[in-house]
Amino acid sequence: MARYRCCRSQSRSRCYRQRRRGRRRRRRTCRRRRASRCCRRRYKLTCRRY
């Protein structure tokens, strides 16, 4: 299952897949179906899958 990161509306083409490398910065991770929900509602962000 690929996890997706939320990106800012300014750079909506820049959505990164969350890799399992040690990154301390945790942003809201979105799944396929919940991508539009978690990113759009609270943070007004767009989630895109590569």
Curated annotation (Swiss-Prot):
GO terms for biological process: chromosome condensation; sperm DNA condensation. Testis. Pfam families: Protamine_P1. The keyword Manganese does not apply. Belongs to the protamine P1 family. Cross-linked by interchain disulfide bonds around the DNA-helix. This is Sperm protamine P1. It comes from Saguinus imperator (Emperor tamarin).
